[in-house]
Amino acid sequence: MARSSTLAFLKTEPGAGFVMTLAALAALALANSPAAGLYFDFIDGRVPVGVGPFFVSLSVEAWVRDGLMAVFFLSAGLELKYEVLRGEISSPRRLAAPLLAGAAGMVGPAVIYLLVNLGPGGDLRGWTVPTPTDAAFALGSLALVAPRLPRALRLFLLTLAVADDVGAIALIGVLYSHGIHWRALALALAVLAVMLLLARRRRPPRLAFIAGFVLVVALTINSGISTSVAAFACAMAVPVDRRSRDGESLLRAYQAALQPYVAYLVLPLFAFVSAGIALSAHPPGGWFSRPVWGVALGLTLGKPLGVFGMVFLSSALKIGRKPMGATWSEMLGVALLCGVGFDLSFFLCGLALPADQQPQVRLAVMAGSALSLAAGSAVLARRQWVRDQRGGADVFAD
């Protein structure tokens, strides 16, 4: 019985977040233990791969960031395409408020970071780091501490998190793609074009899209373009309505197949190679630098201010509305949960900042995310208790 309960928990969003947290804590413990040398030798070890005229040699950390994380971006793209075209956020009225809040939730942390980093000792390059929201942690926490709050809150948070993912992908593509190799890019585009043609067939071959994705990502690694952009483009090529020979929707089949690997392999492994910070190897003053404060305050203050402020403003202007049945207190709790950055914040940290600043800033991401998680969970748990005391109804909705 205990074993079946554990397995059931691990299949939920809180379970996925729990596994990723364990991976990050394990990395932090190893990096500050006698086994630190083995840990850093592992993540820095080079892995050469060559196919025909293309050859690339990257560290394990880089392969996880540029290779495995492409699977995460593919999964996010598939989810976005389905939810917008056929799912819970296909209605324009439902899209308005969370999309506006998602945009403001990226602007808010960026502004806080830039304000903190103006002047001596600041580094303006890290403004993208506190902008994303970690969907697994945020949705998992909502489901764990407040499962009986209005379902519209979850839909709002899901839409906002997906919009954040798209915004992060756009930032990565625009800001962090350098030194383009046109031959590899042209070949990647050619493979993508073939995938689009196959998508028009009545019964597209399932394996062709898998092979196409692998080829596009491999070529993109050689091209200088971020693999996140390539993975997202591959997701857009997968048809929503076309079915494989067994009658199953290709897009839904890929979603179901990828989800456990993303939740329990890709994201935990990314957390493991990213969160290993040797605390003793960095001067104490670095832990209180402007970039560190900018990221921590961006997540804990900028995110909720941007999200909550935009929902309030859009409701006042009648261009959007808060989730149906939810109170402003519950909206505040969700806005606080949006300050959990984690996976994509780690990803952007590795792209935006020099190596000597990354350990301190990654620790700031962990601290800011933990504080946001605790604050949001406390507010939502309190609201859940209040509703339960009133028999599920909130007759004094604020």
Predicted regions and their residues:
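Structural signature of hydrophobic alpha-helical transmembrane segments
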Residues: 61-73, 122-136, 159, 177-190, ...
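Hydrophobic transmembrane alpha-helices of secondary-active transporters
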Residues: 53, 57-86, 236-239, 261-282, ...
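Transmembrane alpha-helices that form the ion-translocation and gating core
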Residues: 98-139, 294-352, 370-382
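Interfacial helix-loop-helix linkers and transmembrane-helix boundary segments
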Residues: 62, 82-97, 122-124, 150-152, ...
